[in-house]
Amino acid sequence: MTVPGTPVGASDEKGDDTLLLTDFTPDSPDLGWYVVNDNVMGGRSQGNFREGSGELRFAGSTNTRGGGFSSIRSMRLQLDLSDHDGIELRVKGDGRRYTWRLTSNARWRGRQVSYWADFETEDGAWSTARIPFSRFIPRFRGLELDGPALDPKQITGMGLMIYDNQDGPFELELASIHAY
């Protein structure tokens, strides 16, 4: 049985109902990734990314004396994923917990809401994290909100974040992003 948002088997077979968003190959769309670290709020965490042929490497160090997070985010997108149930990530982790972040047109007090869902990684092993849209929690600057629920028809951005209340180095390789 697959538990949503946790590593599952290493199969690369895809059914007809999956949608490849990127696999970081030269023919894959450039999602315009950029870094947002906790230094935007006085923190000391550091993180960066490097795209290679067939993967994106996100690495750095978190420091909980401040914001305690590092993230990468895509440029603004317009995705209708309403025919799908969630996001599937192919990752090689370090045993730490990561957060997948989606944004939509939803607003709270006039500001953009982001939606977070955590997933676990296996140290040094490739795994697949399947995260159903129903697991994404609305947040504003980390504060959990009562609503609105994520509307997969209006995805405007995505990102990867480490925010697990641990100090120290992190490294995650991301091979593909699918909607399933």
What are these regions (language model features)?
Residues T2-Y180:
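Beta-rich carbohydrate-recognition modules and glycan-binding surfaces
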